């Protein structure tokens, strides 16, 4: 019984020490970065030139990065970010940072698809549907053309047909 009391007291004491340490050494992030990050679509598609939505939000706030690089967010996102940051909406609606898809069609070759579901599990916007061990298909209206599914397909049955243009 005394062992239980000692361990309870030590656990309580360590909890207080950890709480104080976490409070004292917490990260001092800018709350505006969090607000901008919440506005972004969280598709982590990297079409803006950054590895994900949070690094792009941080660059917008801290480095004055252009706010019109998020392709999936579109013009509504540009308006929302400009109102949060109290800046003007840029004249050019969207900036395409790399060679990107204007009209893309993602096709899954059904004869090669083994139904492993890897493409669907890695799709950041859930544009690929299908059940394990069955053929999968792409919902074109949700697909952002990020090519992540292409990288994870073990049978190379995903094909992206696209028209491209440069900025």
Swiss-Prot record:
For this protein, the record's Pfam families field holds:
Fer4_21 (PF14697), FeS (PF04060)
What cofactor does this chain's UniProt record say it requires?
[4Fe-4S] cluster
Provide the binding site for [4Fe-4S] cluster 1.
Answer: 45, 48, 53, 70
* Reported function: Part of a membrane-bound complex that couples electron transfer with translocation of ions across the membrane.
Q: Which gene encodes it?
A: rnfB
Which positions in this protein are listed as binding [4Fe-4S] cluster 2? 113, 116, 119, 153
Which Gene Ontology molecular-function terms are recorded?
4 iron, 4 sulfur cluster binding; electron transfer activity; metal ion binding
EC number(s) recorded for this UniProt protein:
7.-.-.-
What species is given as this protein's source?
Buchnera aphidicola subsp. Acyrthosiphon pisum (strain Tuc7)
**Protease listed as a keyword:** no
**Protein name, UniProt field:** Ion-translocating oxidoreductase complex subunit B
Q: Where is the 4Fe-4S domain?
A: 28-87
Positions of [4Fe-4S] cluster 3 binding: 123, 143, 146, 149
What is annotated about its quaternary structure and interactions? The complex is composed of six subunits: RnfA, RnfB, RnfC, RnfD, RnfE and RnfG.
Which GO biological process annotations does it have? electron transport chain
Q: Which Gene3D superfamilies match?
A: 3.30.70.20, Electron transport complex subunit B, putative Fe-S cluster
Q: Cellular location of this protein?
A: Cell inner membrane
Asked if the keyword Cell membrane belongs to this entry, the reply reads yes
- InterPro entries for the chain: 4Fe-4S_dom, 4Fe4S_Fe-S-bd, 4Fe4S_Fe_S_CS, Elect_transpt_cplx_RnfB/RsxB, RnfB/RsxB_Proteobac, RnfB_subfamily
Q: Which UniProt keywords apply?
A: 4Fe-4S, Cell inner membrane, Cell membrane, Electron transport, Iron, Iron-sulfur, Membrane, Metal-binding, Repeat, Translocase, Transport
What is the similarity comment for this entry?
Belongs to the 4Fe4S bacterial-type ferredoxin family. RnfB subfamily.
Q: What range(s) does the 4Fe-4S ferredoxin-type domain occupy?
A: 104-133, 134-163
**Note accompanying the cofactor annotation:** Binds 3 [4Fe-4S] clusters.
Q: Name one GO cellular component term.
A: plasma membrane
Region annotation Hydrophobic: residue ranges?
1-22
């Amino acid at each position: 019984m005394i062992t239980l009391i000692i361990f309870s007291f030590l656990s309580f004491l360590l909890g207080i020490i950890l709480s104080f340490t976490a409070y004292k050494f917490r990260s001092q992030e800018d709350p505006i970065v969090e607000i901008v990050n919440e506005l972004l679509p969280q598709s982590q598609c990297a079409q803006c030139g950054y590895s994900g939505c949070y690094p792009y939000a941080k660059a917008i706030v801290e480095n004055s990065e252009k706010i019109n690089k998020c392709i999936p967010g579109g013009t509504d996102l540009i308006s929302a970010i400009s109102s949060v940051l109290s800046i003007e909406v840029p004249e050019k609606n969207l900036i395409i940072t790399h060679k990107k898809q204007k009209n893309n069609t993602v096709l899954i070759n059904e004869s090669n698809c083994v139904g492993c579901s890897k493409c669907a599990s890695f799709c950041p916007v859930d544009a690929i549907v299908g059940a394990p061990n069955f053929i999968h298909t792409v919902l074109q209206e949700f697909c952002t053309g990020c090519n992540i599914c292409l990288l994870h397909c073990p049978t190379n049955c995903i094909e992206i047909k696209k028209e491209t243009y440069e900025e």
